């Protein structure tokens, strides 16, 4: 999975760009392909990204950097809710992540009042992106105690929202307080906290920025001079000695344009280095004569002299509202920022933390996006027998638009088209087949009759049977016209999977067909089996369910650690039920010694490390099981539904396993997203099939 670092904050004015630039510098030192993503953006130029692109020669298309603008995001949230907003942003993030080894995410800027809880939004986005969070806390014009409290609160906020907090950065603190704050924060948080002092040069506007903001005429000065930072403003209108005494390093001198003496005196002082200034701003739309300007240019080559029409004090009001920005046009600020970052941030420690293995946490949305991405990697054709069902049509549109797989929909073609048109659904790219009118019906009837001849099925009878959408779809899979099938939104489980048992049959290494659910909890995915097919498997069958479930888990990126569940743990229980689980566990160990398996084991000991430490200390599975095998359907079905309802888990499935080719059954209460997920899973299962990829009829 692509690594990502999410730099965010808790409010405006934290100088976060310093940290964002520093992290980018660090990443580009270690990784060849670094992408950038900004979830929400304001209208206008993005100076920081332009700096990153120029400095690090990024080839990334600027259009892919941004999730959406604030106005679009606000409208989407108002009309469809925050879940849809997050989902859309996650989609756009993954378009970037798939092309890079690591992604730097630039969090929101807390400048839009239409998102009053941006911290929670940033935390959720970070979790859904699978990103480690680097929160930045602003300390400008705050006491040491206030900064300490803000830093602790920020850590608790992001940590409490389930974020993987990489470290903390407290930025822009008063220089005189920096060491005290750093000492007081040391060892008080479970992650490093680096304290960076305020640097006036970073917040100071450049002379070029001032000229642009005031619409000033550039009378003298070159590009280097215009890039100087105006660290202070000094007003000159009195005698020259008074002005010279007031000069400070890096100041911009503001004086009426008719005071040639002050202009020459200031530039002479600059030339002598007592002190160097940023430039001179002339007011009242007056400029000294040619001779004075020639002298000025010789005294201080390159030093900017600007001219504006207004008087000094209105001009000053506008100047004090300006703040410097990091950008491609301010390379000096970039160097200052990097120097500050590298001095006060332990980059070796940060690099070690960034390079650490990705968190095992997987959110439901992350799992869903991984499914779609994996399905897209090798397109397969999935047949949907319930082509006239509204939910199936909506799911088909999603699958087609996102390029998850190729689709064939079954049913009366004109009825499908009319239903889609009524719903405003575009089925362009989908194949539509009416089994009753298909030219495949005859050959399918002959095939089915041959397969079921031992049951007395004739071609005439088979001709009627294969007009059923589920039988027709199953035969499409068997005969290579589709790679997999998904049905069940309006059909019973028996109606969906009976044709598969009769036609496709089980794999050579599978004793039975079984099922699993992917249980997507808040921070991980567990595999439950069997919760849908086998009522009371014996020890042999239970072992088969376990090994099949482990293979399915691995196929979908879940490292299999198998817990064979029972009402007792280890050797504490006895009786037929627990003996069955014990025997099945030994069969798994003998058949698949490469698998980690524990049993009999109770559910709490399987998933809770604290319980496992007491009941099965030293077990490689207890406390961290990822594949949970239930002893019977009664236990499994009730448990998955209980966890689904009480823990808010998303149950993806059932996913059938053990068939030669993939066929999956939907719940009749399946939502559109459930159908999308199941189709993606079916396509992924088909990718593992040794048979040739199916094509349209």
Swiss-Prot record:
Keywords: Acyltransferase, Cytoplasm, Transferase
GO terms for biological process, alphabetical: acetyl-CoA biosynthetic process
Residue ranges, annotated region (Phosphate acetyltransferase): 366-697
A Pfam family per the record: PTA_PTB
Compartment(s): Cytoplasm
EC identifiers of the protein: 2.3.1.8
Main location class: cytoplasm
InterPro entries cross-referenced by the UniProt entry: DRTGG (IPR010766), P-Actrans_bac (IPR016475), P-loop_NTPase (IPR027417), P_AcTrfase (IPR004614), P_AcTrfase_dom1 (IPR042113), P_AcTrfase_dom2 (IPR042112), Phos_Acetyltrans/Butyryltrans (IPR050500), PTA_PTB (IPR002505)
Superkingdom assignment: Bacteria
Catalysed conversion reaction: acetyl-CoA + phosphate = acetyl phosphate + CoA
Any GO molecular function: phosphate acetyltransferase activity
Gene3D superfamilies reported for this sequence: 3.40.50.10950, HprK N-terminal domain-like, Isocitrate/Isopropylmalate dehydrogenase-like, P-loop containing nucleotide triphosphate hydrolases
Pathway: Metabolic intermediate biosynthesis; acetyl-CoA biosynthesis; acetyl-CoA from acetate: step 2/2
Cellular component GO terms held in the UniProt record: cytoplasm
Description of its domains: The N-terminal region seems to be important for proper quaternary structure. The C-terminal region contains the substrate-binding site.
Main function: Involved in acetate metabolism.
Protein family according to the UniProt entry: In the N-terminal section; belongs to the CobB/CobQ family. In the C-terminal section; belongs to the phosphate acetyltransferase and butyryltransferase family.
Subunit and partners: Homohexamer.
Protein name listed in UniProt: Phosphate acetyltransferase
